[in-house]
Amino acid sequence: MDEFHRYGKEDSSWQQCFLYPLFFQEDLYAISHDHYLDVSSSSEPMEHLSSNDKLSFLIVKRLIGQIRKQNNSIFLFVNCDPNPLVNHNKSSYSESVLEGLTLVLEVPFSIRSKYSVEGINEWKSFRSIHSIFPFLEDKFPHSNYILDTRIPYSIHPEILVRTFRRWIRDAPSLHPLRSVLYKYRNSPENLKRSIIVVPRVNTRFLLFLWNNYVYECESILVPLLKRSFHPRSSSYGSFPERTHFHRKVKHIIRNFRRNSLKSIWSLKDPKIHYVRYGERPIIAIRGTHLLVKKCRYHLPIFRQCYFHLWSEPYRVCSHQLSKNCSSSLGYSLRVRMKPLLVRTKMLDKLFITDLITDEFDPIVPIVPIIGLLAKEKFCDISGRPISKLSWTSLTDDDILDRFDRIWRNIFHYYSGSFGRDGLYRIKYILSLSCAKTLACKHKSTIRVVRKELGPELFKKYFSKEREFDYPAFSSKAAAHSQRERIWHSDIPQINPLANSWQKIQDLRIERKLI
């Protein structure tokens, strides 16, 4: 990458047309095929691969020759697979060509990402899971409105090509990308749609396509939002000091003229914050209701003008934190007022001051969790436990271990919430469902199962000690668990509640597109 960048600085004409010749290099397809075999071997044993899955470089040469002879690279995919992006039984040739196309397009993208980290570009990534919980702890309590939106993934294929065209000067290198996208658009599943729905399948090409599209959305939108509002401050500092400081600033503003407000406003805290998890960005705003209405109005217009796609206004929802809760990542997010007692000693006198501060208070959504358990056949819709019939063929230890693992995952995921009393209702449902499953397996009653297995067995698996049997929990954390907040940033990736809302919204939108 460094060599490409150095050559690009020396010769700008070479920088404009260096991508397209890479499609004719056999080494590129060898690398992509090795990557394809590595991915396949991780999910499928090598002895189960047929002889047709082996790549012949003689056929690769013929495919490269077809690219040289034909102006349109669509013939390359016709000979390999009728629908390479939709059919899961992909041939090694179409997969290798897509991998090679991704490798070529990743060259300028990697250079841009590398030098943006070094300071050439001021844009920073907001999609890290580690940035979500500091946002909730630090920025969320200082906002009074939340804009809940989503990044639209339904877009015309030509718009995707134009996003690449903004930073790739080599126009011929985008012809294979255009052919692949239009091939997918003309597939039987998308014939009734006028736009392409970017599928979220775990392939290198589609992940690269989606990441670049999100990069383009955020690199334009986030600096625009921050430029429209006041500069950011480095930190909030202690709450009492900042509270008295804001009172002084408000007093100064009343006495100054209007033209001097810019220097005063620069001392205040930022008024807008942005974070994203998956396809769902969250914009926290501290301002008036009129400001929130302007943001809701301009966000769809910005997407319509910049990306040439229509985004319905109902996709941007606003929530006032003092009245409503906002659901995200499987939590019900709210802000509550917390009284703070401050004692100040000056010489021989002691002053006691009561301050009211805002505190982030996530709520455990018991009703959605019960709905998810009902969907997985652990209970009915009213929360009454039932037996898990599909697990009756397992051993007793496996059944107990599975139920206990589900409970510990739920408990660890919601360990960042202070009020966890409602979680023990979930524990009751899982423990009783486990007992009913064992009773159904042994064709007996719950009382007989408890008498045969012993009450100590259920205490062993569903005990409070096992709730803290986790590397992040220590003995001190277990003792002070009710007043300490511990976040587990790896669990949202596997928690169904974090993505259930998004799946429902995607199904509604896709039905409207058909």
From Swiss-Prot:
The keyword Ligase does not apply. GO terms for cellular component: chloroplast. It holds the Pfam family Intron_maturas2. GO terms for molecular function: RNA binding. The keyword RNA-binding applies. It is found in: Plastid, Chloroplast. InterPro entries: Domain_X, Maturase_MatK, Maturase_MatK_N. GO terms for biological process: mRNA processing; RNA splicing; tRNA processing. Keywords: Chloroplast, mRNA processing, Plastid, RNA-binding, tRNA processing. Belongs to the intron maturase 2 family. MatK subfamily. HAMAP family: MatK. Usually encoded in the trnK tRNA gene intron. Probably assists in splicing its own and other chloroplast group II introns. This is Maturase K. It comes from Tsuga canadensis.
